[in-house]
């Protein structure tokens, strides 16, 4: 973070800026009024307006096609719980929908791509989310939504480094906030 480097193809310098959770990063950009917006949001009304069935838990799914989608589908089936599945556009959602096809316990709702403000509404409306990417990862936490972070595997294992760093930070937070 805050390191100057050369652009790979142009004769210009770049300043690397990385968001994050420590003093060695650029921190997180959190807009004013976020807590008030979260408290004022009517999640049940949003779910009804977007095709969710009342009385079911709702999971938002936004992953990469390289993630373990068949294993997720098998786990959802094995859990035996009826569920609203709000699927973001993309191949990964197509794969999950095919894997769960014919199982009436799952109310599958296909959502369109939306602007950031509406994406935050999705995250506020659901009981949990499978999300991809660093931005979605942060926005889900800011929405207070339990999440499974579906990282994109890279050859240099950067995804594992990011995940391990977050898990270490999360464990520290749990220890700090633990009632015991």
Tell where the protein language model's regions lie, with residue ranges:
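Short, aromatic/basic amphipathic alpha-helical patches
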Residues: 2-8, 76, 96-102, 162
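A donor-sugar binding/catalytic signature common to diverse glycosyltransferases
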Residues: 113-162
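Catalytic donor nucleotide-activated moiety binding site of glycosyltransferases and closely related
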Residues: 80-112
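Short, hydrophobic beta-strand segments that form beta-sheet elements in well-ordered domains
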Residues: 1, 84-89, 129-131
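A nucleotide-sugar donor-handling region in carbohydrate enzymes
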Residues: 1-69
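Conserved small/polar residues in nucleotide/adenosyl-binding loops
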Residues: 176-180
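Post-HExxH zinc-binding segment in Zn-dependent metallohydrolases
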Residues: 162-171
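Short hydrophobic signal-anchor/transmembrane segments that target glycosyltransferases
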Residues: 71-81
């Amino acid at each position: 973070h805050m390191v100057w480097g050369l652009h790979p193809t142009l004769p210009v310098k770049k300043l690397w800026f990385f968001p994050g959770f420590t003093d060695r990063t650029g921190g997180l950009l959190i807009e004013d009024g976020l807590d008030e917006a979260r408290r004022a949001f009517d999640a049940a009304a949003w779910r009804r307006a977007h095709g969710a069935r009342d009385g079911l838990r709702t999971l938002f799914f936004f992953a990469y096609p390289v993630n373990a989608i068949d294993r997720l589908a098998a786990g959802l089936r094995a859990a035996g719980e009826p569920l609203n599945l709000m699927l973001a556009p993309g191949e990964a959602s197509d794969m999950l929908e095919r894997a769960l096809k014919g199982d009436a316990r799952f109310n599958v709702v296909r959502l369109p791509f939306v602007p950031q403000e509406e994406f935050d509404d999705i995250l506020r409306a659901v009981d949990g989310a499978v999300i991809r990417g660093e931005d979605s990862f942060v926005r889900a936490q800011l929405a207070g939504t339990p999440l499974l972070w579906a990282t994109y595997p890279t050859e240099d294992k950067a995804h594992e480094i990011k995940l391990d760093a977050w898990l270490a930070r999360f464990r520290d937070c749990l220890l700090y906030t633990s009632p015991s």
